[in-house]
Amino acid sequence: MYDELPPELWVKIVDYSGEIALLLTNTSFFELVSLINIKTDIIEYIVDNNLLDVLKYFVVLKNLKHNLIDGKIITLKSLNENLVKNCEKGNIEIIKYLLDIGADIEGKDNCAVLTASHHGHIEVVKYLVCKGANFRANNDKAVRWASDKGHLDVVKYLVSQGSDIRSENDCSICWASGNGHLEMVKYLVSQGVNIRTNDDWAIRLASENGHLEVVKYLVSQGADIRSQDDHAIKWASGNGHLEMVKYLVSQSSNIIAEDNYAVRWASENGHLEVIKYLVSQGSNITSNYYTIIAASKNGHIDIVKYLVSQGVNIRDCDSSAVQIASENGHLEVVKYLVSQGIDFREHDDLTFDMALRKGHVEIVKYLVGQGVDFRVYDDYPVRMASHCGRLGVVKYFVSQGADVRAEDDYAVRMSAEKGHIEVVKFLVDNGANIRADNDYAVRLASENGHIKIVEYLVSMGAVLNKKN
């Protein structure tokens, strides 16, 4: 019934629905294609849906030199792009037909065989190689990509065909190790790959990513876990791989290398169990104040408390820990540090200043509750909050009595200059004089291209003319 509908009606149906699959129910499919304005690529749709019979019909049309195949529907670019896409998916029959109708097996810099290798489609790889694909292109990139993803059968096949697994300075074993492909690593070693290339990059990557069995194997083969100033334990600690850290310590890694970098990085990234273990093994968390600052910066309250319990003196770091916690919005850390006696008013209330600049209104409220003067320096806090566009902070200060007109209406001028339209509107609603200093607010907004603010200020009575 459906294929009896006239082509003109099908054009309207497909245009309206956007369902390109409807074309395939009509015998006038190829005549319709030229009439329908659909963004979907016809070949791409057929390939994505594995419509092999339709593709076979395309081959027939190609042999008949049909104008659609030679012209607007199939182009070399679309064939090559869809060849690569199907090498990714592993649709070997589609791949064969795409090659039959003119796809370039070495197009896009031999991307077809590279993609098939990368995704582990061994039968596709074999077929492409059989058809003449240059599997050694880009300095044997195909075998390196297969190693990276752990496709052992692909690697073995490519090696059997002559690929050099040692290309690019033994990069294959580094990638395989970094991704935890133990059997691949063992195979590569059996083929003579140098596990110590690039200053033991393989074991460093495996440690960094927590692949314990790979690390153990590499150590058994002579890799140096202490290369690059004990890079392995520093990265394992920073990434929270506790069992890896324990193993590396058992193999004599230096946990205090680079001024206790391992425990500092674990503190920054929130790995409490790693920190506890490193401390039990002799890491010095009191030699400098970086650990407490790093933990405070990222809001790791449990680590901050643990470090204090282990003797870290929060006053040794000046007020840096509470300042950075305030800047990054970590209220609980701020409260805890204040409860432990840190001087949060140091450096002219910098802790407070950082919170208001970043818009952390709850921290601002807390610090005001702790005695910080929010009207200091002729209402500098509300002026700075306006300058930074922190509407919530501005509203809080105004609710507490801050003067929005301080310093000749600095707040509305600076918020206009920076493009903070909601702050501008709030300040105007609360009595700011938009015409202060010869309409400075609208002039600044105009100079900086904030057209919506200019329009708003003019609507509220500001004057913008040639003179100003």
Curated annotation (Swiss-Prot):
Q: Keywords assigned by UniProt?
A: ANK repeat, Repeat
List residue spans for each ANK repeat: 38-68, 78-107, 109-137, 138-167, 169-197, 198-227, 229-257, 258-287, 289-316, 317-346, 348-376, 378-406, 407-436, 438-466
- Pfam families cross-referenced by the UniProt entry: Ank_2
Highest rank taxon of the organism? Viruses
Q: What is this protein called?
A: Putative ankyrin repeat protein R873
